[in-house]
Structure formats: C-alpha cells, structure tokens
Amino acid sequence: MPPWAIAQRPWVTLGQSYGGFLTLSYLSLFPEGVAASFTCGGIPHVPASASEVYAHTFPRMAAKTQQYYDRYPADVERVAALADALEKQKPALPDGSPMTVERLQLMGSDFGMKPSFERMHWIIDHAFVDGDGTLTCGASVSDSFLMRAFERTNTRTNPLYWTLQEFIYADGDTMPIRWAAAEEKAHRAEFDTLARPLMFTGEAMFPWMFEQMPELKPFKPAMDLLMEDTSWDKIYDPQRLACNEVPLQAAVYFDDMYVDSDLQLDTLSRVGNSHAWVTNEFEHDGLHGSVVFKRLFDEALNRGDLRQIF
C-alpha cells in the first residue's frame, strides 16, 4: 500500500538522486497520490537502459578525474606510484580483503560531490609511510591510507547499495544486464588499471566486488542469476508520464557525474507538466545547501502549481 493511502491525502514529494527515480515510478503507477513533486539530480532515462547510462557516465567519470588532477597536478604521479605499490605489495584492508588498484579506482565514487577532491588529495598525501606527501621508491603503503580506503569503499552498513545498483534500470522485459558498467569499462582503455594517469571510477559496480568484499560475497550467486534475467516488473509508464498532470519541478545539474543531464532532459521533454531548472552551479549534492530547494519551491509557487496545497 502506498504511504499516501494511509495518510488519506496526496503527498508533496522531494526526490534526491534515486528519489527522483522513485518519483517517476509514483507518477507512473500512483499519480493520484501525489499533489506535486520536486526532484534534484534524479530524473532517470525512460526507457531505462543500464548500458546507455554507463555509456554516458564513464566519460563524465574521466572528466571528473581530470578535474581532480588539474587541481592537484602532483597527484598524477602520486596516484600512479600508489597504484604500482598496491600491485607490488598487495596489502590487505582491515577486514582482510585485498587493497587492489580496482579498489583504489573505486575511491573516486564521490567525485561528483563536494568536497571530494579535497578529501581524496588529503588521503593520497598520506598514502605512504613517509607521511609527508613525498614519493620514495619502494616506500610501503601506510596503515593510515589502508584504513581510510576501507572506510571509503566498504559497504558493511548498506550492502544493497551496490547489489541493486544496475537493477534500478531493469524495466519490464529487457535484455540481460550482464554487468553493464564492467562491460563499458572494458571498452575504455583509459580506465585500465595499467593506464596512466590512473582514472577513477564513479558510481559503478563490478564483478570483482562480489568476489573480494566480504559483505558482498553472499550476494554473488544471486547476482549471477539476476544479471541474466530478462523479465522484470514495469517501473515506468511512458504513456502515463506523457499525460502527467502532477506538477514536477526538477533541478538538473549540468555536470552531474551520476545522472547524466542530457538523459534527464530527454526524459523531461516527454513528461507532462514538468519543468527543469538546469544549472552548473552545483554538484549532485547541491540540495544540501540553502539555495536549490528554495529555487525549485519558489518557481513552482510562482507558477501556481502549489495553489491547491498552500
């Protein structure tokens, strides 16, 4: 039962990131329960396709990595040296899992938010036992780095975050997903673990995670089955969305690393009564400040979309 059925009145919804995906599901399946909707960096492409999503987001991951190196040029050499050291020394993380170059790449998963570059630079600056940011040939990877790498990449408290990452694009009868992110990465030589400068990956999951990370290993048999599945429940109804009457006000972040702005705008062009505010002033987490929601709310209010509510 949808929550508004319990409340016995339509809801005004605010969807951040994946919350925007849920918003379009609500508008597809239960529009009578929604009075108005706001989304921030979270309009999925309809029709949904995991392969299409990663074809758009991997170039954005590369661009964000380059922005990081542009800000901290010395880290090009430091990250390369760290990758070489990980390959040679094969250190273990606090939970016993291997600290690989692939896991180092995964540490860029928050490059689409602030202040991720600063956090990464600080971690890289303390990656070697020397601890002063210098590069010493043969230096050991520091315990401090391994602890912080573990903290940034483990999913002990939210294992379903990665487990369901690609299945949010499984909409009705579809082709097998078959590790869409890994497939896209394999076709991009610049993301190879031996490529330099080393590229960081964003919000993307890979088969090795379910082989190496203790909290994800139990899900591997299920993942192998789900990756071949072709029949899923429908998430979105394009026809119903085209006829949508519920006011939808969306913040689209032009440089969003996670939810491609071109795909968002393509979807919104086919959703009735939708309005987009496109901005490059904010990253994916722009809602945290005091500007974004106020802008969305004021636009909807001034348009008269909230007249029956407030």
Annotate the PLM regions.
Residues 32-87:
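A catalytic-pocket lid/entrance helix-loop region that shapes and gates access to the active site
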Residues 90-229:
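Alpha/beta-hydrolase fold active-site neighborhood
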Residues 9-49:
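Conserved hydrolase catalytic core segment
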Residues 123-125, 246, 260-268:
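Short alpha-helix in the alpha/beta-hydrolase fold that links the catalytic acid
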Residues 1-10:
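Conserved acidic catalytic loop of the alpha/beta-hydrolase fold
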Residues 258, 277-295, 306-309:
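Catalytic histidine-centered segment of alpha/beta-hydrolase-like enzymes
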